């Protein structure tokens, strides 16, 4: 790796649920970001190598960070990427209509991408295989206190078995995979980031995560109805519930 020893770390970014570490850095007077993760996650959708390759495939299809460099060193994967400009989607939380319009715009852009030759699958069978790997290696999120209040399960293996036995029929498109707060809004469009789980998947995966966000920020059900009116879809609550449950141990 050419640049990993040249970057100057400016600070660590706020912690999320991901096991990856993210740092704001400077490289040759340019702000960039360094993302690092232990290589035990290399076979999962936490992999920053996977994220880098997905970003490069998307580079002429959507607005995404530029990949400056990625690779493996001392049992960790590294990704150095460019900084994104614009307002984070969370800046619009106090403006529900604008916030929901941004979500819908982002979904439409993702779902319009031709998925032929997409390098990665995030379909249910892939995610369940990944979840089994995480459970077997004791790196899944099995702390039920982190789960949604609406989750009916209180045992990780019972939930995993239910997910295996109740897989819905998939309507495939390009999915962000961790949709909701992972994009910026600028004068020239939407910029996507945190793309490690991006790939071919059911369109309802991203929709489910948007619904989860809307419910958290806007308890008034009229906003959820507005979201589906904007999408031009009737809600499939069976699928929405499935994908929210699938996300519990990630």
From Swiss-Prot:
Give the main EC class: transferase
Q: Cross-referenced CDD domains, in alphabetical order?
A: APH
- Residue ranges annotated as coiled coil are none
Q: Which organism is it from?
A: Campylobacter jejuni
Question: What Gene3D superfamilies has UniProt attached to this entry?
Answer: 3.90.1200.10, Phosphorylase Kinase, domain 1
Gene that encodes it = aphA-7
Stated EC number for the protein is: 2.7.1.95
Q: Which family does it belong to?
A: Belongs to the aminoglycoside phosphotransferase family.
Q: Which protein is depicted?
A: Aminoglycoside 3'-phosphotransferase
Database matches in Pfam families: APH (PF01636)
**SUPFAM superfamilies (UniProt xref):** Protein kinase-like (PK-like)
The alphabetical list of record keywords is: Antibiotic resistance, ATP-binding, Kinase, Nucleotide-binding, Plasmid, Transferase
Q: Which domain of life is it from?
A: Bacteria
Catalytic reactions of this protein: kanamycin A + ATP = kanamycin 3'-phosphate + ADP + H(+)
Write out the GO MF terms: ATP binding; kanamycin kinase activity
UniProt cross-references to InterPro entries, sorted A to Z: Aminoglycoside_PTrfase, Kan/Strep_kinase, Kinase-like_dom_sf
GO terms, biological process: response to antibiotic
Instruction: List the active site.
Output: 178
Which residues are the signal sequence here?
A: none
**Role noted for this protein:** Resistance to kanamycin and structurally-related aminoglycosides, including amikacin.
């Amino acid at each position: 790796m050419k640049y990993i020893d040249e970057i100057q770390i400016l600070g660590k970014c706020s912690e999320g649920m991901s096991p990856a570490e993210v740092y704001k850095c400077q490289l040759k007077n340019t702000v960039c970001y360094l993302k690092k993760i232990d290589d035990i996650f290399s076979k999962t959708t936490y992999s920053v190598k996977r994220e880098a390759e997905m970003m490069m495939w998307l580079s002429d299809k959507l607005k995404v960070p530029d990949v400056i460099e990625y690779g493996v060193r001392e049992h960790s994967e590294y990704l150095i990427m460019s900084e994104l400009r614009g307002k984070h989607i969370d800046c619009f939380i106090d403006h529900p209509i604008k916030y929901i319009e941004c979500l819908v715009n982002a979904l439409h852009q993702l779902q319009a991408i031709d998925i032929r030759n997409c390098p990665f699958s995030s379909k249910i069978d892939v995610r369940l295989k990944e979840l089994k790997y995480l459970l077997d290696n004791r790196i899944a999120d099995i702390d039920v206190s982190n789960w949604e209040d609406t989750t009916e399960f209180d045992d990780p293996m019972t939930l995993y078995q239910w997910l295996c036995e109740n897989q819905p029929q998939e309507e495939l498109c390009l999915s962000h995979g961790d949709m909701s707060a992972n994009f910026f809004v600028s004068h020239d469009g939407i910029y996507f980031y945190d793309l490690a789980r991006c790939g071919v998947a059911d369109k309802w995966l991203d929709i489910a995560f948007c619904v989860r966000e809307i419910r958290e920020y806007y308890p008034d059900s009229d906003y959820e109805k507005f979201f589906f009116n904007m999408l031009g879809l009737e809600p499939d609550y069976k699928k929405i519930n499935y994908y929210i449950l699938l996300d519990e141990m990630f």
